[in-house]
Amino acid sequence: AATEEHAVILDYLSLGYVNSDMSKFKGKAIAQAIGTDYFTLLELVPKRGVDLEIQDTVYIGKGKRDQIYKVLGKLDYENLTATSRIELEYSIREIVNNNEEKFVDFFNTAGAISTRLHKLELIPGIGKKYMWEIVEARKEKPFESFEDITTRIPSLNNPAEMIVNRVKQELDTTTAK
């Protein structure tokens, strides 16, 4: 499975979960975070004496970690705290904007999934009509930025936000797809 190298802190509970069934972690500091590569929701245990701030980006890879003692594992959307849910959209937007090249590349290279469905159509707001506009425009010249996409396809006025909405949709297991 793909692993995250960095994560953005969504919530930091210095006293742990108040009404936790996980007695092992009751009263122990814990953080909820989102990975910056694959948008994985994670539970992290900070190192002793480390105070984390919401929106901090922390290293959680295989090497030496300065702030994080342990990655407890994946977190389900329904177990996010109220604070994490509020921070989530902002964090996703930041990650998308900080990785513009990667997401613009998706618009340039996404192909068909089947004869009836194209990867671009998985993004909310993109149907057959816009999908073909994107495919035709990228044939002429690959897109260089979100702004370039908007300039060449005015009907897609905010491609970054469309990706943010898709990621939110993917993560929110509480609503029907």
How would you name each of these model-derived features?
Residues D56-L122, S155, M162-K177:
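Long, highly charged, low-complexity intrinsically disordered interaction regions
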Residues H118, E140, E144-M162:
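Compact, charge-rich alpha-helical regulatory domains located at protein termini
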Residues I123-P124, E140:
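Exposed beta-sheet edge/beta-hairpin loop segments within beta-rich domains
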Residues E133-V135, I149:
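Short alpha-helical segments in extracytoplasmic peptidoglycan/chitin-binding modules
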Residues E5-L10, I123, W132, I153, ...:
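Intrinsically disordered, low-complexity regions
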Residues A1-N97:
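Structure-specific DNA junction-binding interface
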Residues G127-K128:
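Small-residue hinge/turn detector
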